[in-house]
């Protein structure tokens, strides 16, 4: 389901930029739609202005060089610990995902999508640790050396129907970007913004 845009009221949800929650520079707001009833939900969510977008891009750009220098082991440990925290809150994340998307708790979310999500993060951790994704090559005859590196900030736009496995903060795109040393700008899907909100508040 798509969210419904509205200019009535003021959203209370903040945005997370450069590691800090702040009031959104709102140009409009929206309410997600309950997929089981077709009715708007009560919670108002902000639609950020270009100033928020620019701030997120600036923060990600400033972080890119630092993240690119991190050893693969440190990135791997982060991804593994993140997967552990997601697993610990799995039941809660599944419940929110079900409420916002209407997808079945079992077997779809709890038995298929959540395990897949955790596995993706752990596979990304293994790739970061091994470094094989760099595909380093040395051509001694031509004195050419090559290797893959992170590209810089990556923006993840999640779909409506995979709130966890393709989520902006948990999905395969997120995991691959982090494993390769890229900072991520995550945009919540307007149909299930509460899922991303919950993912961003892991203890």
Report each predicted region and the residues it spans:
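N-terminal Rossmann-like NAD(P)+-binding subdomain of aldehyde/semialdehyde dehydrogenases
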Residues: 1-141
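Conserved small-residue-rich beta-alpha loop and adjacent elements
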Residues: 134-203
């Amino acid at each position: 389901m798509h969210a419904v845009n509205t200019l009535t009221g003021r959203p209370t949800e903040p945005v997370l930029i450069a590691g800090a929650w702040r009031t959104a520079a709102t140009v409009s707001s929206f309410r997600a739609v309950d997929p089981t009833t077709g009715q708007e939900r009560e919670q108002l969510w902000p639609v950020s202005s270009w100033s928020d977008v620019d701030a997120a891009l600036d923060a990600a750009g400033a972080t890119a060089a630092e993240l690119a220098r991190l050893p693969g082991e440190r990135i791997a440990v982060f991804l593994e610990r993140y997967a552990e925290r997601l697993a610990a809150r799995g039941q809660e994340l599944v419940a929110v995902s079900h409420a916002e998307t209407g997808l079945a708790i079992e077997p779809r979310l709890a038995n298929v999508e959540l395990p897949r999500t955790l596995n993706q993060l752990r596979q990304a951790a293994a790739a970061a640790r091994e470094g094989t994704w760099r595909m380093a090559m040395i051509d001694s005859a031509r004195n050419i050396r090559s290797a893959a590196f992170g590209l810089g900030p990556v923006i993840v736009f999640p779909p409506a129907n995979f709130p966890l496995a393709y989520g902006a903060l948990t999905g395969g795109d997120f995991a691959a970007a982090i494993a390769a040393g890229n900072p991520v700008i995550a945009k919540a899907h307007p149909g299930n913004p509460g899922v991303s909100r919950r993912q961003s508040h892991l203890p």
